[in-house]
Amino acid sequence: IERIVALKPDVVLARPGHKVDERLESLGIKVLTLNAQTYEDMARELEVLATLLGRPGAGTRLWQQMHERMAVLRSEMPKQWQGKKVYFELHSGMAAAGEASFIGQTLHGLGLVNIAGRDLPMYPKLGPEYVVRANPDVIITMADMPVPPPKRQGWSSIAALRNQRYCRIPNAEFDALVRPGPRIDEAARRIVQCLRQLPLP
């Protein structure tokens, strides 16, 4: 707290649920809590931040630019990938990126169908039986995992693994895929790059 106060910031950006927020505000420091979970949240928070920094409209323009880049990326996707099923696994093992999450929105924007549909939470815990039954055409995870999908019992029958359609994103790059913010077009680009290197479905 003391170090933050010493810097005399105009505003502190924070995630919700931190007690430090109240302490900073009691010391007269403005705190902006950001908690984007969807594209709609990100668009709104970017403009709130831009307005706070004295640049109203800049957040909206940035969001539009990102969407334009996303449209270009989708056009670069081989048509064979359109409508194919994807399983996107997060850091925590069997936790998936659901369709309702911003990651799910990115996958949908690229024309992929998420096996963790809208009837599930944003980040559902999927059992191995669920994934095997859903039979995704492609699997996306970080590169270094304790037990990667190809080594999981019973997963060898999944179409993605039978056909070598498994995206292993380097851990250093995976962060851009799973954190909401102005890097969503970068995340989409990384997914497209990986898919273009895999055998076509």
Regions found by a protein language model. Name each.
Residues 43-51, 60, 138, 142-201:
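Structured C-terminal subdomain patch of bacterial secreted/periplasmic proteins
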Residues 15-52:
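Flexible loop/hinge segments that line or gate small-molecule binding clefts
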Residues 57-113:
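Basic- and aromatic-lined ligand-binding clefts that recognize polyanionic substrates
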Residues 100-123, 143, 168-170:
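His/Asp/Glu-enriched short active-site or ligand-binding loop at hydrolase and phosphoryl-transfer sites
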Residues 13-16, 33-37, 88-100, 169-170:
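Short beta-strand->loop
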Residues 27-29, 110, 161-162:
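Short, structured coil segments at secondary-structure junctions
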Residues 1-17, 29, 127-144:
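Proline-aspartate-enriched helix->loop->beta-strand connector
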Residues 9, 31-36, 47-61, 91-94, ...:
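Second-shell loop/turn segments in exported
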